[in-house]
C-alpha cells in the first residue's frame, strides 16, 4: 500500500499530466489468476476453503483495458479507481466461479486467520469508481456479469489452462 502510494506521488510530481489507475482483484485470459486457480483446484480437490472476511472488487482485465483507453482519450489527468462494479468477499467470488464453471465442488468459508498467507491483505480493499464515471460517463461492468462472460469464454476454450 504505502510503496504504491509513494510511487503514485512521485509520478504525479515528475509528470503532472498523467493518469494513475488503481485496480483490484484482476483476472484475464493471459497468465494465472484467482479465477483459474479456484476452477482448477475445485475440479481437482472437490472441496476448497476460501476467506470470507476480505472484501474487494473483482475486475476483468478486458474491462480495465477498455476504460484505460477511454481515459487516455481525455486530458482529465488524475487518480482513477477502475474496478468491476460491486463488492464481494473472496469466498463469494469463489462460489460464483465454481457455480458458473459447473464444477462439483464444496466451497467452505474461513477467516483470514485460518488461512495465513505471506502477504498481509486488508479486510476491505473495495474501490469506488466515482471519478471514472464522472470522466468517461459510464460504469465498469458488474463483477458477476463480467465473470459470467469470462467463464463462458474459458469453457469454450477448454477450461482454464
Show the residue positions of the predicted features:
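Active-site helix of classical SDR
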Residues: 3
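Amphipathic alpha-helical segments that line or abut small-molecule/effector binding pockets
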Residues: 62-70, 144, 148
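Amphipathic terminal alpha-helices
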Residues: 143-161
Amino acid at each position: 500500500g504505502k510503496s504504491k502510494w509513494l510511487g503514485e506521488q512521485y509520478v504525479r510530481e515528475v509528470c503532472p499530466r498523467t493518469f494513475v489507475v488503481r485496480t483490484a482483484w484482476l483476472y484475464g485470459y493471459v497468465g494465472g489468476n484467482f479465477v483459474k486457480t479456484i476452477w482448477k483446484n475445485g475440479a481437482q480437490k472437490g472441496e476448497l476453503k476460501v476467506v470470507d472476511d476480505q472484501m474487494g472488487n473483482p475486475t476483468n482485465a478486458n474491462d480495465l483495458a477498455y476504460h484505460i483507453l477511454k481515459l487516455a482519450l481525455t486530458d482529465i489527468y488524475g487518480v482513477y479507481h477502475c474496478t468491476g462494479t460491486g463488492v464481494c468477499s473472496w469466498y463469494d467470488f469463489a462460489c460464483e466461479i465454481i457455480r458458473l464453471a459447473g464444477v462439483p465442488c464444496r466451497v467452505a468459508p474461513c477467516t483470514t486467520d485460518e488461512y495465513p498467507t505471506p502477504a498481509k491483505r486488508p479486510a476491505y480493499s473495495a474501490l469506488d469508481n466515482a471519478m471514472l464515471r464522472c470522466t468517461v460517463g459510464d460504469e465498469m461492468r458488474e463483477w458477476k456479469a463480467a465473470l459470467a462472460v469470462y467463464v463462458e469464454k474459458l469453457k469454450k476454450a477448454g477450461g482454464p489452462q
